[in-house]
Design a protein with these regions (language model features):
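Small/polar-residue-rich segments within soluble enzyme cores
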Residues: 1-65, 269, 393-398
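Beta-lactam-recognizing serine transpeptidase/beta-lactamase-like catalytic domain environment
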Residues: 47-57, 103-142, 148-378
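Amphipathic, well-packed alpha-helical segments that form the structural scaffold of globular domains
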Residues: 31, 35-38, 81, 85, ...
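Structural motif corresponding to the C-terminal cap of alpha-helices
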Residues: 83-91, 116, 323, 404
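A short acidic/glycine-rich loop-to-helix N-cap element
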Residues: 381-392
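Short, gly/Ser/Thr-rich active-site loops of penicillin-recognizing serine hydrolases
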Residues: 296-299, 391-409
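Conserved, well-ordered alpha-helix/loop/beta-strand core segments that scaffold catalytic motifs
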Residues: 52-96
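Flexible, solvent-exposed loop/hinge segments and secondary-structure transition points
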Residues: 20, 85-96, 100-105, 113, ...
């Protein structure tokens, strides 16, 4: 194999062994069509190993492997990798992931997780570098998951953006206290303000009062936030969520704001895609877009995950409010309306216990009313203080907007 781009997209492409067999990445996933078939020559021999004229003979020529065309834009991929690596360093995290996804088609334009892999140099492969962790690893999403809670409530007709909720300083559940990330006095908020200010208390109470936890659980399943996406990449993670019948009150509250549930960055990106494209349809994320050698058509599944599409416009407007007036101000892309959600989740160690003053940070968003419906996720893990990944998102979307000549409608 020759890798002209070095480490760029190295995790996506993956590794082969000395015999050319795929070991990781797309080399493994598409091994059967990439490696081709060896030829065979069998001759009947006589004395001294000489072929017998007219004897049994098998002559099967070798078959070349097929070419495949991927959705990855290598220049955009390089930019995303460089910006993500810098962002992880600036924020002080242990590792990070980024996804740039076309919500209209399911094409993965760029995807990366630090540390990176250079398939052409195996002398120093870092731990965790051989797979795209945005696909293969679960994490607790934190407040970016609140969008799913609000989508479910809007779909059910339980709330509007102006529905109010009384928010005490904290609420109690099973001897625990739930409060917001930032100190505030008891107040009354609209649903739009709850999302913009990322209130854990407000989100919990709105779901409890206007949807119910069983209703939320059903929608989580419908949105595909507990299942693998079906992406063409080996080792995709599935989500983790226990059945609602086992939920305690504290777990019920926690799920509404993205704790006590695990999923992959690609799973949440797919969900946001169904909002960004305005149709409620989620397209299977994928890399393969063409098989030119065979001419075989490549198709991918789509699913109507948001059934009441009347919920999409008000939800999008509320996500715009997050960037205009709330926790996501630093994500605003100049010249465009920007919608999205910040997330800060407490970091859980290998035992499942939360580590004090250690966080996973993320942002996922899109550009409403633009000529291209790209969704971008950026997450940084194991950060020793509360910050955000908004600026990395902003820079990636700014680069994409310029590169693809995206215009505001």
């Amino acid at each position: 194999r020759v890798y002209p781009y070095g480490s760029t997209a190295g995790q996506i492409l993956g590794l082969v062994d000395v015999d050319g067999n795929g070991q990781t990445g797309l080399e493994l996933y598409y091994d059967d069509i990439l490696k081709g078939e060896a030829g065979k020559l069998v001759l009947q021999q006589g004395a001294y190993g000489m072929p017998i004229p007219g004897g049994t003979e098998v002559d099967e020529p070798a078959k070349d492997g097929q070419d495949i065309i991927l959705s990855i834009d290598i220049d955009m991929q390089q930019y995303v990798e460089e910006r993500l690596k810098q962002g992880v360093s600036d924020i002080g995290g242990e590792d990070g992931s980024a996804v740039l996804y076309d919500a209209d088609t399911g094409d993965i334009i760029a995807i990366a997780s630090t540390p990176y892999l250079d398939p052409s140099d195996r002398s120093n492969i870092e731990e965790g570098a051989t797979s795209v962790k945005a696909i293969t690893t679960q994490f607790e999403p934190g407040s970016i998951f609140k969008t799913a809670s609000f989508c479910a409530m809007l779909e059910a007709g339980g709330i509007t953006a102006q529905t109010t909720v009384d928010c005490p300083v904290y609420i109690e559940a099973d001897e625990y206290k739930i409060s917001d990330a930032h100190e505030r006095a008891a107040t009354t908020m609209t649903a739009a303000e709850v999302l913009a200010q990322s209130s854990n208390v407000g989100t919990s109470l709105l779901v409890q009062q206007h949807l119910g936890f069983s209703g939320l659980y059903d929608k989580i399943r419908k949105y595909g936030l507990n299942d693998a996406t079906g992406v063409d990449y080996p080792g995709e993670a599935e989500g983790y969520l226990t059945n609602v019948s086992t939920w305690s009150l504290i777990q019920s509250y926690n799920v509404t704001f993205g704790q006590g549930i695990s999923l992959s960055p690609l799973m949440i990106t797919r969900f946001y895609g169904a909002i960004a494209n305005g149709t409620g349809v989620a397209h299977t994320p994928h890399f393969l877009i063409a098989k030119p050698s065979s001419g075989e058509e490549v198709t991918w599944d789509s699913e109507q995950i948001i059934e009441n599409t009347d919920a999409i416009a008000p939800l999008t407007e509320m996500l715009e409010g997050v960037v205009e007036n709330g926790t996501g101000k630093m994500a605003a892309v100049e010249g465009y309306t920007t919608a999205g959600k910040t997330g800060t989740a407490e970091y859980a160690d290998d035992s499942g216990s939360y580590v004090k003053n250690m966080y996973n940070l993320d942002f996922v968003g899109f550009l409403p009313n633009a000529t291209s419906n790209l969704v971008c996720f950026v997450g940084v893990n194991h950060v020793p203080y509360e910050r955000n990944t908004c600026e990395v998102f902003k820079d990636i979307m700014t680069e994409a907007s310029s590169r693809y000549k995206i215009a505001q409608k």
